[in-house]
Curated annotation (Swiss-Prot):
Sphingolipid-delta-4-desaturase required for the biosynthesis of delta-4-unsaturated sphingolipids and derivatives. May be required for the biosynthesis of glucosylceramides. This is Sphingolipid delta(4)-desaturase DES1-like. Keywords: Endoplasmic reticulum, Lipid metabolism, Membrane, Oxidoreductase, Sphingolipid metabolism, Transmembrane, Transmembrane helix. GO terms for biological process: sphingolipid biosynthetic process. It comes from Arabidopsis thaliana. Disulfide bonds: none annotated. A motif (Histidine box-1) lies at residues 103-107. It comes from the Eukaryota. The keyword Membrane applies.
Amino acid sequence: MGKGGREKISSNEEEREGVMATDFFWSYTDEPHASRRRQILSCYPQIRQLFGPDPWAFLKITLVVILQLSTAAILHNSGWLKILSIAYFFGSFLNHNLFLAIHELSHNLAFSTPVYNRCLGIFANLPIGVPMSVTFQKYHLEHHRFQGVDGIDMDVPTYTEAHLVTNIFAKTIWVFLQLFFYALRPIFIKPKPPGYWEFINFLIQIVLDVSVVLFFGWRSFAYLILSTFVGGGMHPMAGHFISEHYVFNPNQETYSYYGPLNLLTWSVGYHNEHHDFPRIPGNKLHLVKEIAGEYYEGLESYKSWSQVIYMYIMDTTVGPYSRMKRKLSKSD
């Protein structure tokens, strides 16, 4: 894994022999990002200057929210085929952009004051149609701190998913329904009681949803929901769900994407760089690779998220088990 160091990996032999594995890849070392972060900062301390909020985040989010809600209003009398087409080829990009804006805000990368980021996250959530921004932050920060840890990292598929999704047809359905699995996984595996801010998130979202239906009709609301659903399934933008941590190389558990869709996704494709430095906003992650390139050049990466989806579905050795897992270390 380049200068980040190699991991000790244990997995069944099936995947290496051309058959889908029957268990996860189990690692007996810590996740690679903390150690690589220390190494890079010792060599390039100037990277600390990249830490901090993106001053343009508020403006970018506001423009996308206004554009998407305006589009929903314009489509209030449109036919269903037109609504579905615009949702897939236009609205999906906007709502997925907002989902990844919420990801950015979960790291407090719009404002220095956390509560301002939380409020902006609730605002960014509006066109998505389903309240999720506050809950997402609670689980996502654990994904960083406990990457791959059994029972804590909710980004890793469940054993039920892995047992059921074992062929091309099942993987195709799984990709279509990715958002549902991401949403339901924490409820069954690691439920957390909702807090004050989640109720605020829920209340504001319901007010917006009801207002859209009352003022513009169900078709406008359906456009927003469809934009969320299709953008999180069989869609180029959704390729990052698979590309980030699904193991195509048993010696690497995080992968970056260096393609054009980074322009629309807050550079979430720079995923090794993001996990190494979660305090650096997306608009500066490319500078990490430019400054400390030798730490990333030896790592496998992607240039097409659509190709990643195709590889995941068609490769008979890859499935939900193709994830790195580890037990909780005593130091945690």
